[in-house]
Amino acid sequence: MKIAVYGKGGIGKSTTSCNISVALARRGQKVLQIGCDPKHDSTFTLTGFLIPTIIDTLQSKDYHYEDIWPEDVIHKGYGGVDCVEAGGPPAGAGCGGYVVGETVKLLKELNAFYEYDIILFDVLGDVVCGGFAAPLNYADYCVIITDNGFDALFAANRITASIREKARTHPLRLAGLVGNRTSRRDLINKYVEACPMPVIEVLPIIEDIRVSRVKGKTLFEMVGFEPSLNYVCNYYLGIADQILSQPEGIVPKEIPDRELFSLLSDLYLNPIGGGGQKKKNQENLLGFTRI
């Protein structure tokens, strides 16, 4: 099974992806996580350091695939999860989709692409071109990470459009949304009412999740010396169980941009309450922070 994880930049995709990968490994799956971001930090919480990228390795070998061994590009992470970082082209040049294609090509050359029960692609930011949508060419399911803010749901809607387009020629389905760092879910509920799709899980705001990223550890590793965090791991195990159930999934139909803006801004402009609290609610509903 191949899963592509998308979502707005900074929403917590990599942290979520790493914890889902460990959860899947805990369920007995052989897992490979592929980071698809020029920052090459997708697998940081699994390995504790920035591993060399596929592109760096190819360049060092003058793109001679026959000179590359699996251990040159596949690194062992926490919980037995194997890790690969695709890397990216130089800033302002090249195409991210090409890099993903080269990564898959190399893994196939190494006879590694089909050795895993689960391959999870952790993909950068919003879908803004066909190149960034390239991992969807290989995925069976897409999982969208969001929060209860306008920007994250707007990005989710763009990703939804890309899934619909790719599903015309590939056996791709949307598994559902995962809410991250979400103290309330009124905008999420409003969105999925208008654009029906499953909500796999909604994680509340948990400071230890953010701290785990800074420490370079998954929640599963942290729970070894902080047992009180076990309840957080259960969220990710629940997500893993839903993925392993091989859900039917859906081919979603995105909402037109103007309609989505009107839908979500209506709740922003007409919150319940008044006075200073009303103004504060308006800022929070759209994910804005006044500085």
UniProtKB/Swiss-Prot annotation:
Subunit description: Homodimer. Protochlorophyllide reductase is composed of three subunits; ChlL, ChlN and ChlB.
Keywords: 4Fe-4S, ATP-binding, Chlorophyll biosynthesis, Chloroplast, Iron, Iron-sulfur, Magnesium, Metal-binding, Nucleotide-binding, Oxidoreductase, Photosynthesis, Plastid
Parts forming coiled coils: none
Gene, per the UniProt record: chlL
Similarity comment: family membership: Belongs to the NifH/BchL/ChlL family.
GO cellular component assignments: chloroplast
Cofactor binding, per record: Binds 1 [4Fe-4S] cluster per dimer.
Intracellular or extracellular location(s): Plastid, Chloroplast
Stated role: Component of the dark-operative protochlorophyllide reductase (DPOR) that uses Mg-ATP and reduced ferredoxin to reduce ring D of protochlorophyllide (Pchlide) to form chlorophyllide a (Chlide). This reaction is light-independent. The L component serves as a unique electron donor to the NB-component of the complex, and binds Mg-ATP.
Name of the protein: Light-independent protochlorophyllide reductase iron-sulfur ATP-binding protein
Phylogenetic lineage: Eukaryota, Viridiplantae, Streptophyta, Embryophyta, Tracheophyta
Cofactor(s) for this UniProt protein: [4Fe-4S] cluster
Reaction equations catalysed: chlorophyllide a + oxidized 2[4Fe-4S]-[ferredoxin] + 2 ADP + 2 phosphate = protochlorophyllide a + reduced 2[4Fe-4S]-[ferredoxin] + 2 ATP + 2 H2O
Pathway, per record: Porphyrin-containing compound metabolism; chlorophyll biosynthesis (light-independent)
PANTHER family linked to this entry: LIGHT-INDEPENDENT PROTOCHLOROPHYLLIDE REDUCTASE IRON-SULFUR ATP-BINDING PROTEIN
Provenance organism: Picea abies
